[in-house]
């Protein structure tokens, strides 16, 4: 075989005289690394480069034994930041993912030179070319440097567009003015809060427009006005097989709630970066487990109950899978575990409620106390068991009777009654349904209840239930 051809050297190195000191490799600017090629990915992806920056955020691996952090740090081009230029096209910030690197983690404010491979991290399964990713550097070496001018946070007065956020990726930013918590659905699981600029929450599309294309367009507008405040942890705090649940939440505590509608003010800069397919505000240090590091203050009060006319009080209450039939009695049924690794709720079973009698007693006690405290005359219930649909019983009202009995036992007398199921029910129902309960001394049902069946509800929602009521005008007569 022919001998292998010797690799050619770059022109600068090939012309170098023997014994001559070689020049240090040229530094590549962070903005050059962030310059996209095809799509949003860096044009230098998979190449090894060397760059210089100021450390603006640090997330050391193993900082907290109970929480998995981001395991890296963020750098920004020295002397950059300050006034936001909405027309800028590339970012001056970059995430450095330490991973298995044995290099020492620098501290916030350090000036460093990092040599490593350019990578794109999506953080979601089944990522496609359109999935938002994070440009990052996987380091081979990290060297202390000098002559780094400090960086300034870029002030933001709202949620930038996607292209603008791409040009601010991994940069230090300071959101200005007041923001509002518009969703906290993911707070208990991932420690995040969904924020929108201003003082008002965003409304669900179908509260404003009709379902369909108009609602889809409205939700897209809402998404463009929303960004999550993260906690720099990737731990699922509800996974009790891990130990994240033992740590304090970043933005939530007893006596200090983070309710939808509460206002948020940023007191410290954060990093704008892409995580799990979307942009987020990331604190410069892990705040999960360390709430004193929070970059925000949260203020708000629950609005007072409005004064309204009328003498009949109607309420709605989601009993969250109230099942008097228990998972422990269903063959093969497993459960979701609590922090003590005991089954509490059914998992992938015909039933969906409490797994054990103790878990059911805990659930029932809370629901009974809440409904009796609300003190409504009529309560529409959601997510109460339908034993017929699950095949457990022929008594469609079995769980409903159980709840009413518990309410009356707590009240000390026969205060509550339930509206019986109508004689005609849909052939295809879910194992949870809707129901009505009412106070017998205040109101009475008129005729039978009616379930409005339609194929549109099958597999998507519970069929609506309607019941006419009339108030009882005195102790002995209905009027």
What residue ranges belong to the model's regions?
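N-terminal, active-site-proximal structural segment of metallo-dependent hydrolase catalytic domains
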Residues: 285-433, 471-473, 477
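Extended non-catalytic accessory segments flanking core domains
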Residues: 19-345, 363-365, 443, 452-463
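Low-complexity, acidic Ser/Thr/Pro-rich repeat tracts that form intrinsically disordered stalk/linker regions
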Residues: 2-26
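Surface-exposed patches in mature extracellular/periplasmic domains of secreted proteins
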Residues: 39-44, 60-65, 121-126, 378-383, ...
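Conserved hydrophobic/aromatic pocket- or pore-lining residues that grip, position, or stack substrates
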Residues: 270, 318, 379, 437, ...
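Short regulatory "switch" loops immediately downstream of catalytic or recognition motifs
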Residues: 59-61, 77-83, 234-236, 386-388, ...
């Amino acid at each position: 075989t022919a001998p292998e051809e010797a690799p050619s050297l770059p022109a600068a190195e090939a012309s170098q005289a023997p014994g001559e000191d070689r020049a240090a490799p040229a530094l590549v600017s962070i903005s050059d690394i962030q310059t996209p090629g095809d799509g949003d990915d860096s044009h230098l992806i998979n190449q090894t480069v060397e760059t210089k920056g100021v450390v603006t955020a640090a997330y050391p691996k193993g900082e907290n034994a109970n929480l998995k952090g981001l395991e890296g740090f963020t750098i920004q081009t020295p002397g950059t930041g300050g006034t936001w230029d909405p027309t800028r096209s590339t970012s001056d910030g970059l995430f450095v993912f330490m991973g298995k690197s044995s290099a020492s983690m620098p501290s916030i404010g350090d000036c460093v030179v990092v040599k490593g491979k350019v990578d794109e991290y999506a953080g979601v399964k089944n990522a496609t070319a359109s999935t938002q990713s994070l440009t990052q550097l996987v380091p081979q070496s990290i060297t202390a440097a000098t002559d780094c001018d400090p960086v300034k946070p870029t002030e933001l007065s709202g949620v930038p567009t996607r292209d603008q956020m791409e040009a601010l990726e991994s940069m230090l930013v300071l959101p200005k003015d007041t923001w509002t918590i518009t969703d906290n659905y993911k707070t208990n699981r991932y420690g995040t809060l969904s924020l929108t600029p201003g003082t008002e929450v965003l409304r669900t599309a179908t509260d404003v427009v009709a379902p369909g294309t108009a609602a889809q367009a409205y939700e897209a507008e809402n998404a463009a006005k929303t960004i999550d405040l993260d906690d720099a942890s990737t731990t699922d705090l509800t996974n009790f097989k891990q130990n994240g649940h033992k740590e304090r939440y970043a933005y939530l505590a007893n006596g200090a709630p983070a309710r939808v509608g509460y206002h948020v003010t940023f007191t410290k800069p954060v990093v704008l970066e892409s995580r799990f397919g979307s942009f987020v505000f990331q604190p410069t240090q892990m705040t999960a487990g360390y709430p004193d590091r929070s970059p925000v203050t949260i203020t708000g009060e629950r609005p007072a109950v409005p004064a309204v006319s009328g003498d009949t009080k109607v309420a709605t209450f989601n009993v969250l899978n109230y099942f008097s039939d228990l998972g422990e009695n269903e063959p093969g049924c497993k459960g979701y575990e609590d922090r003590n690794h005991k089954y509490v709720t059914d998992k992938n079973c015909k039933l969906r409620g409490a797994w054990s009698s103790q878990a059911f007693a805990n659930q029932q006690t809370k629901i009974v106390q809440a409904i009796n405290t609300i003190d409504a005359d009529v309560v529409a219930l959601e997510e109460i068991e339908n034993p017929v649909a699950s095949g457990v019983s022929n008594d469609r009202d079995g769980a409903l009777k159980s709840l009413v009995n518990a309410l009356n036992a707590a009240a000390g007398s026969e205060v509550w009654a339930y509206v019986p199921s109508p004689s005609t029910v849909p052939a295809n129902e879910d194992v949870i349904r809707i129901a009505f309960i009412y106070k017998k001394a205040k109101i009475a049902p008129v005729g039978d209840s009616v379930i409005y069946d339609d194929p549109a509800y099958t597999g998507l929602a519970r069929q609506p239930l309607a019941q006419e009521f009339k108030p009882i005008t005195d102790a002995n007569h209905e009027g």
